[in-house]
Design a protein with these regions (language model features):
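Exposed beta-strand-loop-beta-strand "reactive/processing" segments of non-cytosolic proteins
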Residues: 252-272
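Structural motif
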Residues: 272-280, 327-333
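Surface-exposed loop/turn elements that mediate protein-protein interactions on large endomembrane-trafficking
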Residues: 231-241, 281-297, 336-341
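Short consensus segments that form the blades of beta-propeller domains
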Residues: 102, 268-272, 323-326
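Sec-dependent N-terminal signal peptides
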Residues: 1-21
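A generic "folded-domain core" signal
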Residues: 17-244, 254, 275, 344
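Beta-propeller blade termini
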Residues: 250-256, 305-309
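Short aromatic loop motif centered on NTY/YTY
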Residues: 290-368
């Protein structure tokens, strides 16, 4: 019924060459529960993902929440619901057709979502590669109510029809109501009532990058790895494990972080569409190498990142661990160098491969 994301091989390869460092910094631990402040309640900022039958739901550290529905026939279409944490916010529902030939549909063709015989026409998103449409404003509330109570949903356009699963829809929306303090309020997704809503979103952490520094002598193009890093037992092991491909072994990159610190990335594993590197923070010339500690939204730091790129102008290191080659599922992360450490800037994650573009994945971590 669903197309699962396969990250197992990459994670096993990663684990074979790395061990988390004791005492490594992690993303700031958000509140586990809501907190009362005056007459308002500060919502929980704990990132979380849940599965409700066929539906996936997630809320990030700012209490922005999402729910996703797959097509009954795998890889044919999807539905995305998002809801900001403001008590008066309205949900946004997006749908996407991903069936064979969908990309050739007339760009002006309407996308229609029919729920138990009731048709809702969505506004097309103009700049999407695949047919994607959006319900928003006052038109979205009837759609949400129908999804929660519905038995059958069909997405159609230009003669194509794709059935979307509603199994778990009401439970996923109820969970979002609970996370955002909407139960029994007028703006609840499912359990609507008259209780006044008085909630405040959790404050997002502020991340400030260190000033940019010159990069003369650093970058890509297979720089020579300093001897102090080559001598590390973990690096020797991973050099051996990547020796089957001479091009993988050359995927070393470096950067100057400041006058006293450098960044060096060493290939650790490679697959058809993922390249993992271990990152070290060193002294000048690669001396005194220490594995970098990259915090993650769910609290477990790592020193290995996948398909990584470092932008010295913004002091940002990005990673994109693909669940499959087309990149419609996986984990996308960015960290900012503050002058003392790499701090998580943002993270989004799509566990199910169903054709959702990466810019529409649910966020787990956001910053200011």
């Amino acid at each position: 019924m669903r197309s699962g994301m396969v990250l197992t091989a990459a994670l096993v390869a990663l684990a074979a060459c790395q061990r988390d460092q004791d005492g490594a910094p992690v993303a700031p631990a958000p509140e586990e529960t809501t907190t009362a402040v005056g007459a308002s309640t500060v919502l929980s900022g704990r990132p979380e993902q849940r599965t409700f039958r066929d539906w996936r739901a997630a809320c990030d550290n700012g209490a922005l929440c999402f729910a996703f529905a797959p097509s009954v026939r795998p890889d044919a279409g999807w539905l995305r619901l998002s809801l900001a944490p403001d008590a008066r916010a309205a949900p946004v529902v997006m749908v996407g057709l991903w069936s064979p030939g969908a990309e050739r549909l007339d760009p002006a063709a309407d996308l229609t979502l029919t729920i138990d015989g009731r048709a809702f026409v969505a506004a097309r998103v103009d700049d999407a590669d695949q047919p994607i449409a959006r319900f928003g404003g006052p038109d979205v509330v009837p759609v949400v109510r129908a999804l929660a109570a519905g038995k059958r949903a069909v997405l159609s356009a230009g003669g194509q029809e794709v059935e979307l699963s509603l199994s778990g829809a009401a439970a996923a929306m109820l969970w979002i109501d609970e996370r955002q303090g909407r139960l029994e309020t007028p703006n609840a997704l499912v359990r609507v009532g008259e209780r006044p809503a008085a909630t405040t979103p959790p404050a997002l952490p502020r991340v400030t990058g260190a000033p940019a520094v010159g990069q003369t002598g650093f970058g890509g193009d297979n720089p020579t790895l300093p001897a102090a890093i080559e001598a590390l037992p973990a690096v020797k092991q991973c050099r051996q494990e990547t020796s089957w491909n001479e091009y993988v072994g050359k995927e070393v990159f470096s950067a100057r972080l400041d006058d006293r610190k450098e960044l060096w990335a060493v290939p650790r594993f490679a697959g058809a569409y993922n390249l993992g590197v271990q990152v070290f923070v060193t002294g000048p010339g690669g001396r005194d190498p220490a594995p970098a500690a990259f915090p993650t939204a769910l609290g477990t730091p790592t020193d290995t990142v996948v398909n990584a790129e470092y932008d010295p102008a913004t002091r940002t290191l990005s990673a994109f661990n693909k669940g499959r080659g087309i990149g419609d599922c996986g984990i996308a992360q960015r960290w900012t160098w503050t002058g003392a450490a790499f701090v998580l800037k943002d993270q989004s994650e799509m566990r199910e491969c169903m054709g959702v573009p990466a810019d529409l994945w649910p966020t787990l971590w956001r910053t200011r």
